[in-house]
Amino acid sequence: MIIGITGGIASGKSTVVKVIRKAGYQVIDADQVVHDLQEKGGRLYEALREAFGNQILKADGELDRTKLSEMLFSNPDNMATSSAIQNQIIKEELAAKRDHLAQSQAIFFMDIPILMELGYQDWFDAIWLVYVDAQTQLQRLMARNRLDKGKARQRIASQLPIEEKKPYASLVIDNSGDIAALIKQVQSALLSLANPR
């Protein structure tokens, strides 16, 4: 069984993943896969450098993720170019990791922030959506990424609204409360997995 984990930016997916890993389950982290591919010499690094030039690199030749983010979120054409380049490479890499893990794990998870936006729904037997109300999401994103309200709203707007993701979810984990309530929901869901009725 493969379970997809998704949710809006700053919704609390990382905390959910920590609880799942602590329970002994494997989780493929799409953001980490992307990060690895963007390392100097990686497939995405080379593809992005070819598309946007050396202006997206730091002095030491590493990818300047902050500069790249600013370029993408401020310009829809740049975002479209980047998405077209990256999505295929990322999909290939995630599929390889999924297929490898499926050989040894009966149940595992894949944390993909923009799962619905990229059309990954068919990969999963179940999808867990981490939900947070819009105001809380905005405040958390501003605090976490040190963004002003305008930039935070811009990032949130680049993703499918959470309400449009809900119909795809087999489980909605509500993270509008405190961390203890979030952990309890995840532990309960994991218990149901281990002991299906």
Swiss-Prot record:
Signal peptide: none annotated. The keyword Nucleotide-binding applies. Its EC number is 2.7.1.24. GO terms for biological process: coenzyme A biosynthetic process. Pfam families: CoaE. It is an enzyme of class 2 (transferase). GO terms for cellular component: cytoplasm. Coiled coil: none annotated. Keywords: ATP-binding, Coenzyme A biosynthesis, Cytoplasm, Kinase, Nucleotide-binding, Transferase. Pathway: Cofactor biosynthesis; coenzyme A biosynthesis; CoA from (R)-pantothenate: step 5/5. SUPFAM superfamilies: P-loop containing nucleoside triphosphate hydrolases. It catalyses: 3'-dephospho-CoA + ATP = ADP + CoA + H(+). Belongs to the CoaE family. Catalyzes the phosphorylation of the 3'-hydroxyl group of dephosphocoenzyme A to form coenzyme A. This is Dephospho-CoA kinase. It comes from Streptococcus pyogenes serotype M28 (strain MGAS6180). The gene is coaE.
